[in-house]
Curated annotation (Swiss-Prot):
One of its GO terms (molecular function) is tRNA binding. Gene3D superfamilies: 1.10.8.50, 30s ribosomal protein s13, domain 2. This is Small ribosomal subunit protein uS13. Residues 91-121 are annotated as: Disordered. Part of the 30S ribosomal subunit. Forms a loose heterodimer with protein S19. Forms two bridges to the 50S subunit in the 70S ribosome. Belongs to the universal ribosomal protein uS13 family. It comes from Staphylococcus aureus (strain NCTC 8325 / PS 47). The gene is rpsM. It holds the Pfam family Ribosomal_S13. InterPro entries: Rbsml_uS13_C (IPR027437), Ribosomal_uS13 (IPR001892), Ribosomal_uS13-like_H2TH (IPR010979), Ribosomal_uS13_bac-type (IPR019980), Ribosomal_uS13_CS (IPR018269). Disulfide bonds: none annotated. Keywords: Ribonucleoprotein, Ribosomal protein, RNA-binding, rRNA-binding, tRNA-binding. GO terms for cellular component: cytosol; small ribosomal subunit. HAMAP family: Ribosomal_uS13.
Amino acid sequence: MARIAGVDIPREKRVVISLTYIYGIGTSTAQKILEEANVSADTRVKDLTDDELGRIREVVDGYKVEGDLRRETNLNIKRLMEISSYRGIRHRRGLPVRGQKTKNNARTRKGPVKTVANKKK
């Protein structure tokens, strides 16, 4: 397995697909990376030369991926919570942040149903 940005990418898959195993790189970003590194998108990872892998690594190092990206998103959420913005309060309470209704659904964000006794009638 080739290692790029601290992630083992699968050898049997095409380079475009295997780059998406890195957190922060989707298909369009993977295509841009390969274009910058002058590597064909159709080649398999096992067929890449060391030179091509090195060029891909250099280009990926220019992007914010994996741990750095996760850290930045967590810090952004913490900052929202510290300044007590509306979004920060929603994060703190574990409710949907982007304006969704919560009367009926939002179970993923709120967690399992907490049954209240004698609610009927």
